[in-house]
């Protein structure tokens, strides 16, 4: 008799194929779920494999449009970044995948969900916190945290032996000495040889982005139009055909930015980051589209965003949003509160940025706006007396100097010399 139906996040790889068979051995019915978030994947082959192993159903949900509109573009608006360089490609995909998995679990009458995340990574937290927010009564079956599973499958050999026993087809390719996770925003590489932070990644590891040294000698120019902080149009000249190409749909804009950046060596990083579970981890990332869109967006904000709004956003909204996304706290009251602050900061971010991509570099060529009036070249010009007179600054400095003078007097009274 079945113990009930479980919705398993299935990748088609060795780990989740073994988990699928193991769940069947435990007496569960299993719905194999996959989310299409733009990764390179043979979904038909994954379906065939899951059903052959014994899944009662295979469901693949196309999340690409929702991923861009609901997650990736708001991340561009808020300039999301973790520890200065990581643009959160993996973290940003988790809420959309988790929601799709819970939706499938509900549709298929599953009492539980399951995944193949390890017990030392961030993803187990990101997925499960999302699951519990979206369906508070759901049960999570987490094999890699269950002694009866991880003690039985202590290494890859145990997984391969079990796969052979169950007739699970395993690709006869040499396992690469690192693990990967891919979506349309980026791909990550970690573990294996990368666990030594001083090991230089081999050239053949990088899958998506051309080596900057091998990138074209001819630069690629493009323009990106923003409305209320959202990229709404991307235009470029195809260097091979000399034809102008313009795209406006959110997914098309994102993919065009991705393809152009990848071809020109833009978006590779290699970092050591702090995981939510208080471990340091080395990761290599290819984050082409977010690198281009974020840099263009930051540049346009310099022209169109109020100074005080920008400082408040940068000091509070951006770091907290980025931290919450990294930690898997998307479906929480605090993240809902933070997300509500993004759009009000972006209402004036309207204009066009001209960008050049060249051998790994994103070069801003210029920016303009037809609607916003914060920038007036005559006000800051050295050649014109407009806005305010030079003598007006005397009073401004005098007011600003009041507390500075008191600070200097205090130091003098205490016999403390101000030093560099």
Curated annotation (Swiss-Prot):
PROSITE patterns, A to Z: ARGININOSUCCIN_SYN_1, ARGININOSUCCIN_SYN_2
Assigned keywords, A-Z: Amino-acid biosynthesis, Arginine biosynthesis, ATP-binding, Cytoplasm, Ligase, Nucleotide-binding
Documented EC number(s): 6.3.4.5
Primary subcellular site in the record, as a coarse category: cytoplasm
Binding locations of ATP: 9-17, 35, 114-122
Binding site for L-aspartate: 118, 122-123
Coiled coil: none
Any one GO biological process: urea cycle
Pfam families the record matches: Arginosuc_syn_C, Arginosuc_synth
GO CC, alphabetical: cytoplasm; cytosol
Superkingdom of the source species: Eukaryota
Pathway: Amino-acid biosynthesis; L-arginine biosynthesis; L-arginine from L-ornithine and carbamoyl phosphate: step 2/3
GO molecular function: argininosuccinate synthase activity; ATP binding
pH dependence statement: Optimum pH is 7.5-8.0 for the forward reaction and 6.0-6.5 for the reverse reaction.
Catalytic activity: L-citrulline + L-aspartate + ATP = 2-(N(omega)-L-arginino)succinate + AMP + diphosphate + H(+)
Subcellular location(s) per record: Cytoplasm
Class of the enzyme per the UniProt entry, highest EC level: ligase
Keyword Membrane: no
Binding site for L-citrulline: 86, 91, 122, 126, 179, 188, 273, 285
Alphabetized HAMAP family for the sequence: Arg_succ_synth_type1 (MF_00005)
Family in the record: Belongs to the argininosuccinate synthase family. Type 1 subfamily.
Subunit structure: Homotetramer.
Note: Present with 1870 molecules/cell in log phase SD medium.
Full protein name: Argininosuccinate synthase
Name of the coding gene: ARG1
């Amino acid at each position: 008799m079945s113990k009930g139906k479980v919705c398993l996040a299935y990748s088609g790889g060795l780990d989740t194929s073994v988990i699928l068979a193991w769940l069947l051995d435990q007496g569960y019915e299993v719905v194999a779920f996959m989310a299409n978030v733009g990764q390179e994947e043979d979904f038909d082959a994954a379906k065939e494999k899951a059903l052959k192993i014994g899944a009662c159903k295979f469901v693949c949900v196309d999340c690409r449009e929702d991923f861009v509109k609901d997650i990736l573009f708001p991340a561009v608006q808020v300039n999301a970044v973790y520890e200065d360089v990581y643009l959160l490609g993996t973290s940003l995909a988790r809420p959309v995948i988790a929601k799709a998995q819970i939706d499938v679990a509900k549709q298929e009458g599953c009492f539980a969900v399951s995944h193949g995340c390890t017990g030392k990574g961030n993803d187990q937290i990101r997925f499960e916190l999302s699951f519990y927010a979206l369906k508070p009564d759901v049960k999570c079956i987490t094999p890699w945290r269950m002694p009866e599973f991880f003690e039985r499958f202590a290494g890859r050999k145990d997984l391969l032996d079990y796969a052979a026993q169950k007739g699970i087809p395993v690709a006869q390719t040499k396992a690469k000495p690192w693990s990967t996770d891919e979506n349309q925003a980026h791909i990550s590489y970690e573990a294996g040889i990368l666990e030594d932070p001083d090991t230089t990644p081999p050239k053949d590891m990088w899958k998506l982005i051309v080596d900057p040294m091998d990138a074209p000698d001819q630069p690629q120019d493009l323009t990106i139009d923003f409305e209320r902080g959202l990229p709404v149009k991307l235009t470029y000249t195809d260097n091979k055909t000399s034809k102008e190409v313009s795209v406006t749909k959110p997914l098309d804009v994102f993919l065009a930015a991705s393809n152009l950046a990848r071809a020109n060596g833009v978006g590779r990083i290699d970092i050591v980051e702090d995981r939510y579970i208080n471990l340091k981890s080395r990761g290599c990332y290819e984050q082409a589209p977010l690198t281009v869109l974020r840099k263009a967006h930051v540049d346009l904000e310099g022209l169109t965003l109020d100074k005080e709004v920008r400082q408040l956003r940068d000091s509070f909204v951006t770091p907290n949003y980025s931290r919450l996304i990294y930690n898997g706290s998307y479906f929480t009251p605090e993240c809902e509160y933070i997300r509500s602050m993004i759009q009000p900061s972006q209402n004036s971010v309207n204009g066009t940025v001209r960008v050049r991509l060249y051998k790994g570099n994103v070069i801003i060529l210029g920016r303009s706006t037809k609607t916003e009036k914060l920038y007036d070249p005559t006000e800051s010009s050295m050649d014109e007396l407009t806005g305010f007179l030079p003598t007006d600054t005397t009073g401004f400095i005098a007011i600003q100097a009041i507390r500075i003078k008191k600070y200097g007097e205090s130091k003098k009274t205490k016999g403390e010399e101000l030093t560099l």
